[in-house]
UniProtKB/Swiss-Prot annotation:
The modification N6-acetyllysine is found at K101. It is found in: Nucleus. Belongs to the SMC family. SMC3 subfamily. The keyword Coiled coil applies. Central component of cohesin, a complex required for chromosome cohesion during the cell cycle. The cohesin complex may form a large proteinaceous ring within which sister chromatids can be trapped. At anaphase, the complex is cleaved and dissociates from chromatin, allowing sister chromatids to segregate. Cohesion is coupled to DNA replication and is involved in DNA repair. The cohesin complex also plays an important role in spindle pole assembly during mitosis and in chromosomes movement. This is Structural maintenance of chromosomes protein 3 homolog. Keywords: Acetylation, ATP-binding, Cell cycle, Cell division, Coiled coil, Mitosis, Nucleotide-binding, Nucleus. The flexible SMC hinge domain, which separates the large intramolecular coiled coil regions, allows the heterotypic interaction with the corresponding domain of SMC1A or SMC1B, forming a V-shaped heterodimer. The two heads of the heterodimer are then connected by different ends of the cleavable RAD21 protein, forming a ring structure. One of its GO terms (cellular component) is chromatin. ATP binds at G31, F32, N33, G34, S35, G36, K37, S38.
């Protein structure tokens, strides 16, 4: 095992992170003085020691920011498995000082200090004495040690201190044994003297006991006579009491019968009330439904009326529209007929023009050779004029075509827009359709929610009726139990709580509202706190005064009015201001299983603790009142779980109680039921509100649905109107395209005619044809024909214009007819809505009739139940009168029974006292026969004489016998303890001797091992000399003298084996001999300083063999050596390095550098150290500079 690497940061002079890689062999660190060489060895010591506390000296102190933390990390080679618990070939140990804490990490895992110590000790590292780290001055210190000091040093390395500590512990135990033996002997002497005096006292005690037994017998017989007399008296009283009980039982039976009858009638009455309540609820429900239904009917009727009015108006409008449509259809027929006739005229005119043109052409061809020059120019001009007219007409037709094409484009664009709007309206109608479906689903959900709410309301009403029935039952019990004054107190407190001038937060309420009691202790608490339940608790005196002023004010208001029995206030309100209550000291109740403090059985508001403590002070719950006489002597008030009470003044009340439930139970039950009723009512009210909200939502849904349907219908009508527009637009497109085609045909005809005229001119020019000479050849005149053609064309134009006008009129008629059709189409949808409303109205009216029948049924049922209730109440009143009579009789009988019970209680007290005395008679003692014949006077005289004799023994020690037995037991225990101490004394001696032997054996074995290597290493360092270690021991004479000296100093009373206290090994000396003369020996003190340092180094190297360490750390080991010794030491270290030992050395000498395997140069800049690997030349330069500085100084 050796150190492979050291990494440190913030440690001493090494501020920045520094890494140093080491190898096996000799590693030399060289640097100037104060550069930080020794800090590397200090870092190794910091890791290998158990220092885990925060120390400021380890932190770097330099220029710049202060360093708050540091760490040192060492990587060990574990190839030889020194750290046997780790399988890794390298072990990384790291210590970190941070935030005033030290943390240890092994292979990056945090461990505790104890685990770390165990880890180091497992691989042989002694953390308390690191003798393989040799600092400056440590070699000189060892070389100057005496023989005893060397021995102690070896012991500390070996761990012999553990033996010394064990030896000291054993010696202290031995001293304790001696002191205990002395005390036991003293106790023996004291016990003997005490035993003699107790023997006399015990004899007097026996005589006293005889007389006391006789007195007990006399008391016993006297008590027997008294007990018989009291027993006879009690039997007489019990027989009278039994007679009275029988009478009361008879009366009680009559009372129970009447109660049973009353409870039956009350049950009937409650059932009737419940039926009335349920009928009333159903009636209210039907009334509310009827009102709602009527509202809906009115609403629907109004809607239907409005729709019918609108329908009538629209029907009248439709009639006019139908008339208009019929008229339009007639006009359309006429126009179509007219158009047909015009079309036929146009065709006939065009044929006539064509015929005339043909005739002209024929004439021109016939008269080719007969034209004169005079008419030629005239005819040409005419034809050219005709051509000009045709050109004018062609230009006009061209404009018309452009105009019609432009109009056609506009119509096409308009059709695109209309198609787009159709798509938009279709999407809108689909959207409105989906919205209508959603509204339908929503309305169905709302109807379902309404049905569920109505079902919950019916369930809630049944629960409310049950709660009301329970309230009636509990209220009856409440009226029986609670006084009328308390009821009036509750009323006045309600008025106080409603008063604004009194702060409500200062009023805590009644005592019964501020406590909570378990069922087990309810009867006991009722007995004690019954008269305090309706005490009003307030915070301070000011609030109490305001309440009193308010009550007085109310009284004055009532006195000013006429007397009203119902409003008169009977009760007296008790008010307790908490701040004015006197506070008592805390009282500790006795720790007894048979009692429970009553205040611990009550859970209460912490503010009323002092008030409760005043009421329940020294009040306890006991199992039975018979066992509470001892507590009455200590002024405790006792009460049992059944509510029987015995006060500290001796007053007792309780016994048989017919009430099954007390005030607390009934009051809280009534309170809970009222809260439940309130919750149920609020729940029903909430459900009704939900139903109203659902109805409003349904109305909104129906309104939105009708508006959405109207929108959808509007979309449908717009789609229809757009379709009509598209149809008319398409018709216009068709007509315009026809018109354009017609114009094109006309243009072609005109072009043809123009070409013909041009041909005529050419013919005239070529042949000198004169068309005007037709009369000469016997044909029609060309001019007259041309005139006719012109007239025909004018007529044709007129007919065509008329045709276009009629066509435009036809389009307008079609448009009007489509508009009327769309309006009639919309009214069909509105008729469907009216039918739906009529169906809803019919259903509502049927439902209204059903509700009216239910109303009549429930009203009749309520009247019948009220009649039955009056009969039941009259019978209950009769039963109450009989009950009062029976109760009076029972009260008289109870009064007589109480008197007899009081007499019996006195007799029973006397009987109990006698019974107690009888119980106190010692068991196992036979009754004396002579006292059986004595009467009461003889027994009392004998008792007097015995008591006089007992007075003589008034000072007798009654505990003498007990003390004698105790003393004998103590005496036997002392004997046992004496024997145990002797055996332990012997065992301790044996243990001390065993420890001494073990220590000596370990020392001798270590000495043999060290001596061998010391001689070997010394011979390598001093070639002409030999050395050995000598173990010094005492001889017998010296041992006895030492024994005597120790015994005189300690002044022991008896002889002790002093081998326990004295070590026979006194020291280790070093004997040196010369090879030339072996008889001549030297000690270490006779050597020079350098030689002694070499011997000390040799001894240090030998100590390595104790734990087989494989590394050493020397700080300037060769400082005090001359050149020869440094050479020899270097050779020795080189030899040990070859054997596997690692050396890390700081030095200023060149000799060690010759044999070193690695050189490390340390430099310091601005109080920060830096280390790096260097060469021998660099190291020599640093050493030479240091030597020069040393010579100069």
């Amino acid at each position: 095992m050796y150190i492979k690497q050291i990494r440190l940061k913030g440690f001493r002079t090494y501020k920045n992170e520094t890494t140093i890689d080491f190898t096996r062999g000799i590693n030399c660190i060289v640097g100037f003085n104060g550069s930080g060489k020794s800090n590397i060895l200090l870092a190794i010591e910091f890791i290998l020691s158990d220092v885990c506390e925060y120390k400021q000296i380890y932190l770097h102190e330099g220029i710049g920011n202060a360093v708050r933390n540091c760490y040192v990390e060492i990587i060990f080679d574990n190839s030889e498995k020194y750290f046997s618990m780790f399988k890794e070939s390298e072990i990384k140990i790291k210590k970190v000082l941070e935030n005033m804490k030290c943390e240890i990490f092994v292979n990056d895992k945090n461990i505790s200090k104890n685990q770390y110590v165990e880890l180091l000790e497992s691989c042989g590292l002694c953390i308390n004495n690191l003798y393989n780290i040799i600092k400056q001055g440590q070699i000189i210190k060892l070389s100057n040690m005496k023989d005893e000091e060397i021995l102690n040093y070896l012991k500390s390395i070996l761990g012999a201190k553990i033996f010394e500590e064990k030896k000291k512990d054993a010696l202290s135990m031995l001293k304790e044994c001696d002191s205990k033996k002395v005390t036991i002997e003293k106790e023996f002497n004291d016990m003997n003297s005490k035993l003699e005096s107790l023997q006399e006292e015990f004899e007097n005690f026996l005589e006293y006991k005889k007389l006391e037994k006789e007195k007990v017998h006399l008391d016993y017989f006297l008590n027997e006579i008294n007990y018989k007399n009291i027993y006879e008296e009690t039997q007489m009283l019990k027989s009278k009491l039994q007679e009275l009980k029988n009478k009361t039982q008879d009366e009680d039976n009559h009372l129970n019968l009447s109660n049973n009858n009353k409870s039956e009638y009350n049950e009937k009455l409650n059932k009737m009330k419940l039926e009335i309540a349920s009928c009333q609820n159903h009636l209210n429900k039907t009334i509310s439904e009827d009102i709602q239904n009527k509202r809906n009917i009115v609403h629907l009727q109004m809607l239907i009326d409005e729709k019918i009015k609108e329908k009538n108006i629209k029907e009248s409008q439709n009639k006019n529209r139908i008339k208009n449509i019929n008229q339009i259809n007639e006009f359309i027929l006429r126009v179509n007929e007219k158009l047909q006739s015009l079309k036929s005229d146009i065709v006939s005119k065009e044929k006539q023009i064509e015929n005339k043109n043909n005739e002209i052409n024929m004439l021109l061809s016939k008269n080719k050779n007969k034209n004169t020059d005079a008419n030629y120019s005239h005819n040409v001009k005419k034809i050219e004029k005709m051509i000009n007219d045709i050109n004018i007409e062609l230009s006009f037709l061209e404009k018309e075509t452009i105009k019609n094409e432009k109009y056609l484009k506009e119509l096409e664009e308009e059709s695109k827009v209309l198609n787009k709007s159709i798509k938009e309206n279709e999407t809108l109608s689909q959207k409105y359709g989906s919205e209508i479906n959603e509204l339908n689903n929503k309305s169905e959900k709302c109807v379902e929610q309404k049905r569920q709410c109505q079902q919950k309301i019916s369930e809630g009403t049944t629960n409310l009726n049950e709660i009301k029935c329970q309230i009636i039952e509990v209220n009856d019990k409440y009226d029986e139990i609670i006084k009328s004054s308390n009821k009036e107190i509750l009323k006045i407190v309600d008025l106080i709580m409603a008063e604004k001038s009194i702060k409500r937060e200062n009023i805590l309420g009644f005592l019964i509202d501020n406590i909570n009691v378990d069922k087990t202790y309810v009867k006991a608490v009722d007995t004690i706190l019954e008269n305090h339940y309706f005490t009003l608790i307030v915070e301070d005196m000011q609030t109490a005064k305001k309440i009193v002023e308010f009550i007085e004010k109310k009284r004055e208001e009532r006195t000013s009015k006429e007397f009203n029995f119902k409003e008169f206030y009977f009760g007296k309100l008790t008010i307790v201001p908490l701040l004015n209550i006197k506070k008592f000291n805390e009282f500790n109740y006795p720790n007894d299983k048979n009692i429970v403090p009553l205040i611990k059985c009550v859970n209460y508001n912490s503010k009323i603790y002092e008030f409760l403590k005043n009421i329940l002070f020294k009040t306890i719950i006991v199992k039975s009142l018979e066992s509470c006489e001892n507590y009455l002597e200590d002024n405790y008030n006792c009460v049992n779980i059944d509510g029987d009470y015995l006060s500290k003044h001796g007053f007792m009340y309780g016994g048989y109680n017919k009430k099954k439930y007390g005030i607390y139970t009934v009051y809280n039950k009534l309170k809970e039921l009222k809260e439940e009723e309130k919750k149920e009512k609020s729940h029903i009210e909430e459900l009704n509100n939900n139903i109203e909200k659902i109805d409003d939502e349904l109305r909104n849904i129906y309104d939105t649905k009708s508006s959405t349907v109207a929108k959808k219908n509007g979309c449908a009508s717009t789609i229809n109107s757009i379709n009509n527009n598209i149809y008319s637009n398409e018709e216009n497109i068709r007509l315009t395209s026809e018109k354009i085609n017609y114009i094109q045909e006309k243009k072609q005809n005109l072009e043809q005619h123009k070409d013909q005229l041009k041909m005529q001119i050419l013919q005239l020019r070529n042949n000198n044809v004169n068309p005007d000479e037709s009369e000469k050849v016997g044909s029609t005149d060309i001019n007259s024909l041309n005139d006719e053609v012109k007239k025909l064309k004018e007529e044709l134009n007129k007919i065509r214009n008329e045709y276009d006008d009629f066509k435009n009129k036809l389009e307008l008629l079609y448009q009007k007819r489509n508009e009327n059709d769309s309006s009639i189409y919309m009214e069909e949808y509105e008729d469907v809505d009216i039918d739906e409303y009529n169906n809803d109205l019919a259903d509502k009216k049927d439902h209204s009739d059903k509700i009216e029948k239910e109303k009549i049924h429930y009203e009749q049922k309520i009247r019948e139940i009220n009649k039955e209730m009056e009969n039941v109440k009259s019978s209950i009143d009769k039963i109450l009168i009989n009950e009062k009579k029976h109760k009076k009789k029972i009260l008289d009988l109870c009064h007589q029974m109480n008197q007899i019970n009081e007499e019996l209680r006195i007799l029973e007290g006397k009987e109990e006292n006698i019974r107690k005395k009888k119980v106190l008679l010692p068991q196992g003692i036979q009754e004396l026969e002579e006292y059986r014949t004595y009467d009461k006077q003889q027994l009392s005289a004998k008792l007097k004489s015995v008591t006089m004799e007992l007075k003589k023994y008034s000072n007798v020690n009654e505990k003498a016998g007990d003390r004698l037995n105790i003393l004998m037991n103590d005496f036997n225990e002392l004997k046992k303890r004496h024997e145990e101490i002797n055996s332990s004394h012997k065992n301790i001696k044996d243990m001390i001797q065993h420890i001494g032997k073990k220590k000596d054996e370990a020392l001798e074995a270590t000495y043999v091992k060290i001596n061998k290597y010391f001689s070997e290493y010394f011979s390598l360092l001093f070639k002409n000399r030999k050395a050995s270690l000598v173990l010094k021991k005492m001889n017998e004479k010296e041992y006895k003298e030492k024994l005597q000296e120790m015994s005189e100093k300690r002044i022991k009373r008896r002889i002790i084996d002093e081998e326990v206290y004295i070590d026979k090994i006194t020291g280790i000396s070093i004997n040196i001999t010369s090879n030339d003369d072996e008889k001549m020996t030297y000690t270490i003190q006779e050597l020079s300083g350098g030689e002694r340092s070499i011997v000390a180094i040799c001894l240090f190297l030998c100590l390595n063999k104790i734990d087989n360490f494989s590394f050493f750390f020397f700080d300037e080991i060769d400082a005090a050596l001359d050149t020869i010794h440094r050479d020899n030491l270097s050779l020795l270290l080189k030899e040990l390095a070859h054997r596997g030992t690692q050396f890390i050395i700081t030095t200023f000498r060149k000799e060690l550098l010759e044999y070193s395997d690695n050189m490390y140069i340390v430099k310091i800049v601005d109080r920060e150290s830096y280390i790096s690997k260097g060469t021998k030349n660099e190291a020599y330069e640093i050493i030479s500079i240091e030597e020069k500085h040393a010579l100069e100084n």
